[in-house]
Amino acid sequence: MATAEKPVLTRYKDRMDKAVLSLKEDFAGLRTGRASSGLLDQIMVNAYGSMVQLNTVASISVPEPRQINVNIWDKGVVSAVEKAIRNSDLGLNPVVEGNNLRIPIPPLTEERRKDLVKIAGKYAEAQKVAVRNIRRDANDDLKKAEKASVISEDELKKMETEVQKITDGAIKQVDEALKTKEQEIMQV
């Protein structure tokens, strides 16, 4: 019967992988000293009477390490896109050039870099908590299965060990992603 429970573990592993992926998406929105199109992924624009993501009304490119270009397809939303970028908490000031926005990426101050590292740490900690909650859910489900005599006590212990290994792997991925992002942020 243990083989019937194996998919349960893969389901929890998938959830943990999604938590790590979510962290990487959060990190993409954190500004570093270099330009990245991912920096603008979270920006929502008030266009056509509703809030839409920036990439649905424009194409984003990075021609230089310290500049982002936004090519807006409809002239009518240029001011809305500019306003959305300016009002974001990224501290960017776009320059309008017809249908294009040129966004210079100013170098970060040492203080701002340290703040960004703290924010990245908070993101990472939130995902670690999410991973641990998934582990708790998995262990609870395994204990319920053991109580219902679906799996034996030995299988329970074996599967709990496997869940812990999966959890350790996910936590390690979070730590590695955080370390990489910290290095990226602190790089001058």
UniProtKB/Swiss-Prot annotation:
It comes from the Bacteria. It is found in: Cytoplasm. It holds the Pfam family RRF. GO terms for molecular function: ribosomal large subunit binding. GO terms for biological process: cytoplasmic translational termination. Keywords: Cytoplasm, Protein biosynthesis. Coiled coil: none annotated. Belongs to the RRF family. Responsible for the release of ribosomes from messenger RNA at the termination of protein biosynthesis. May increase the efficiency of translation by recycling ribosomes from one round of translation to another. This is Ribosome-recycling factor.
